[in-house]
């Protein structure tokens, strides 16, 4: 049975590593990552609504104690 010639394996592996690294970097560069939303200046958006100038809250009535 003939012996397996492994004399070129080191050269092939050492050439493969930078190639895989380069391919991975190019793949990562082409990906679109999520961009966080930009902070908006609240002074830029002004709407003329009737509830904008006043502060209103709606309260529920207090619950009555249970009668037993």
UniProtKB/Swiss-Prot annotation:
**Family note:** Belongs to the ATPase protein 8 family.
Q: Which segments cross the bilayer? A: 8-24
- GO molecular function, one example? proton transmembrane transporter activity
Q: Which residues carry this modification: N6-succinyllysine?
A: 54
**Coiled-coil stretches, from where to where?**
none
GO cellular component labels: mitochondrial membrane; proton-transporting ATP synthase complex
Q: Where in the cell is it found?
A: Mitochondrion membrane
Annotated positions of the N6-acetyllysine modification: 54, 57
**Purpose:** Subunit 8, of the mitochondrial membrane ATP synthase complex (F(1)F(0) ATP synthase or Complex V) that produces ATP from ADP in the presence of a proton gradient across the membrane which is generated by electron transport complexes of the respiratory chain. ATP synthase complex consist of a soluble F(1) head domain - the catalytic core - and a membrane F(1) domain - the membrane proton channel. These two domains are linked by a central stalk rotating inside the F(1) region and a stationary peripheral stalk.
State the oligomer form and interacting partners: Component of the ATP synthase complex composed at least of ATP5F1A/subunit alpha, ATP5F1B/subunit beta, ATP5MC1/subunit c (homooctomer), MT-ATP6/subunit a, MT-ATP8/subunit 8, ATP5ME/subunit e, ATP5MF/subunit f, ATP5MG/subunit g, ATP5MK/subunit k, ATP5MJ/subunit j, ATP5F1C/subunit gamma, ATP5F1D/subunit delta, ATP5F1E/subunit epsilon, ATP5PF/subunit F6, ATP5PB/subunit b, ATP5PD/subunit d, ATP5PO/subunit OSCP.
Q: Which GO terms describe its biological process?
A: proton motive force-driven ATP synthesis
User: What's the name of the protein?
Assistant: ATP synthase F(0) complex subunit 8
Question: Record's InterPro entries?
Answer: ATP8_mammal, ATP8_metazoa
Q: Report keywords, A-Z.
A: Acetylation, ATP synthesis, CF(0), Hydrogen ion transport, Ion transport, Membrane, Mitochondrion, Transmembrane, Transmembrane helix, Transport
């Amino acid at each position: 049975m003939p012996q397996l010639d492994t004399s070129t394996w080191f050269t092939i592996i050492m050439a493969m590593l930078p190639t895989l690294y380069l391919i991975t970097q190019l793949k990562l560069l082409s990906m679109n990552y999520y961009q966080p939303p930009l902070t908006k200046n609240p002074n830029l958006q002004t709407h003329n609504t009737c509830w904008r100038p006043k502060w209103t809250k709606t309260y529920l009535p207090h619950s009555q104690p249970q009668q037993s």
